[in-house]
């Protein structure tokens, strides 16, 4: 046995009649409509849908599969997915090959006068900013394609671990973890609308006839931005899936805390029902179930931490690139707004709409990513805090708690961008602080450029 492993001794007077027993829920009487925290044993086993966890995100999965960013996996069973077939693997390989070919073509176009008509500005600084922004978009999406192709096996392993974990929850408690991913469709529609609107604005801003090369560059530019944003939404959805499962075990553990057990003794549950509080998730559990549930919670927590870190490992390079690209895009568009508002010439409605569309897209994505990472990290680190409040009325329970707190549960976890910085609820504030600093630098360059135009050097005679 590894020196880092530990064993919790179960009470000898209790025996299991079934390897995966289902107890009547201690939270509330049996009902037909159960939520994620009910442990009622259903009268008849219900048949699950294919991929019960990922059924709610099938739309975004279909988009990523069609674009080659996700493997077209095969369904082995309700709780297991298998590797893609040779045909599906060849399709993904072909799509990625087309993407890399277009990337090389677009990078070549950026370094030649072919793409000059796509840049509209009044100053040289503006042209440089737009050129760098377009190059960062291409590099971000190319890196996303490379990383997704490299992490195909890891992503399938993460999906299988989530499915197996849900299977264990269903066998142990008869519970289906409820989840609502309606925001995914809204984000997909918003991303598509923003990209289409931005491309239309760009076409109308070009003076003269647009060349076929510019059309290709614009179309691929929109597709790259859209798919990169879609992958960020997918990563946020995975984190929300993990958050729901962390929340489940924390609510299960919260029923054993001193406060909840004290309420049970004083008849707090009856008083809450009289006040109309029907929330079943805070009702205390019977302490006699704590040794059994503690083993399940510890095992599930370790699996969730492994999934959490696996998602971070699969996405960290993509996140670094995307955050850098978003930072630069937000900064340049804020700068363009400043130039339009403070300029002496006529304000261009086209540029204003362009800037607002970009800001809405990137700020919403940054907010979604920061919130998803922050919620999941907070819930993962809350387990040890809840465990410290468990009502340990006997030495047996206290030993279990001590063993929990001396292991990895007490170590805080972070979702990082390749280890450079943590992504949480404060990330958006940090990004806007950096945007403000860089915006001041750009404004100083603009003022320097304006001063050179207003004060020309006199010719020497």
UniProtKB/Swiss-Prot annotation:
Compartment list: Cell membrane
Function text: Gustatory receptor which mediates acceptance or avoidance behavior, depending on its substrates. Required for the response to N,N-Diethyl-meta-toluamide (DEET), the most widely used insect repellent worldwide. Functions as a pheromone receptor for a male inhibitory pheromone and promotes male-male aggression and suppresses male-male courtship. Also promotes preferentially virgin females courting over mated females.
Family: Belongs to the insect chemoreceptor superfamily. Gustatory receptor (GR) family. Gr21a subfamily.
GO biological process: chemosensory behavior; detection of chemical stimulus involved in sensory perception of bitter taste; male courtship behavior; monoatomic ion transmembrane transport; response to toxic substance; sensory perception of bitter taste; sensory perception of taste; signal transduction
Membrane side Extracellular: residue ranges: 122-127, 202-214, 339-348, 436-461
Name of the protein described by the UniProt record: Gustatory and pheromone receptor 32a
Tissue: Expressed in the adult labellar chemosensory neurons. Expressed in tarsal neurons for male-male courtship suppression. In larvae, is expressed in neurons of the terminal external chemosensory organ, and the dorsal and posterior external chemosensory organs.
Lineage per the UniProt record: Eukaryota, Metazoa, Ecdysozoa, Arthropoda, Hexapoda
